[in-house]
């Protein structure tokens, strides 16, 4: 499709729906926490300091868990299973947040942190492996991929924000979960398009990767001109 493997567009839409749900939820979180306890669309009535502290903690953890998710995928379960597991956990997280209760809000945020750890580093790992045979197309592939990121962020903030403001907070959070579920299902159904890319790693595969990385490093060092 457009000179690229069909798997690229599976990743495009999976990432787009994930970013839709992420940014759709993110744009609501602090507004919901700081909204008045009374009125047509009540929130939790937190002050800005406490709401910012919760959001900051959540954002910090989002950058920590991908380290562990990448290690687990690389050594044990493979990139594809990591994406599936992460997608399912994130879907549950968004749906939990739609209940608007303190228990489910914290449970949902915890699921999003864990799910992102599995999902985020391994999507781009699949994309990178897909283009090993034709690296000259990789730049174009990443451009298309990040168009999905931007499109998902734009529509997520707009639609979830509109629904939360005009219908109710839980509908906005729930819409994020619906689109995350959509991304999960389309990735699962399209798995055959990836062939062996991102499968559960074997010892032979790990050794081959290590050898290839060593060869690339050696080749790069040989190509460098001697400055002396």
Describe these PLM feature segments:
Residues 1-10, 133, 161-228:
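Intracellular loop-helix junctions on the cytosolic face of multi-pass helical membrane proteins
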Residues 16, 93, 103-119:
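Hydrophobic core of transmembrane alpha-helices in multi-pass small-molecule transporters
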Residues 27-50:
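Short amphipathic helix-loop junctions that connect adjacent transmembrane helices
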Residues 62, 137-165, 172-183:
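Glycine-rich segments within core transmembrane alpha-helices of 12-TM secondary carriers
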Residues 75-87, 134:
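Cytoplasmic membrane-interface "Motif A"-like loop-to-helix N-cap segments
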Residues 84-106:
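C-terminal ends and interior cores of transmembrane alpha-helices
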Residues 118-132:
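Intracellular juxtamembrane helix-capping segments at the cytosolic ends
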């Amino acid at each position: 499709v457009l000179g690229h493997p069909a798997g690229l567009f599976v990743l495009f839409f999976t990432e787009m729906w994930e970013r839709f749900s992420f940014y759709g939820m993110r744009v609501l979180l602090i507004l919901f926490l700081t909204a008045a306890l009374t009125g047509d669309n009540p929130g939790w009535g937190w002050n800005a300091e406490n709401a910012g502290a919760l959001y900051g903690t959540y954002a910090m953890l989002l950058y920590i868990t991908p380290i562990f998710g990448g290690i687990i995928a690389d050594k044990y379960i493979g990139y594809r299973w990591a994406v599936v597991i992460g997608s399912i956990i994130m879907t549950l997280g968004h749906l939990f947040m739609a209940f608007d209760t303190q228990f489910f809000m914290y449970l949902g945020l915890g699921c999003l942190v864990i799910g992102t750890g599995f999902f985020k580093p391994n999507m781009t790992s699949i994309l990178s492996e897909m283009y090993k045979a034709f690296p000259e197309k990789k730049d174009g592939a990443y451009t298309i991929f990040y168009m999905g990121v931007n499109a998902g962020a734009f529509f997520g903030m707009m639609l979830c924000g509109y629904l939360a403001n005009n219908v109710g907070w839980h509908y906005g959070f729930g819409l994020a979960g619906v689109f995350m579920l959509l991304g999960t299902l389309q990735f699962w159904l399209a798995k055959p398009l990836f062939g062996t890319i991102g499968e559960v790693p074997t010892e032979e595969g790990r050794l081959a990767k290590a050898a290839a990385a060593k060869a690339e490093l050696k080749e790069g060092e040989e190509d460098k001109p001697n400055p002396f």
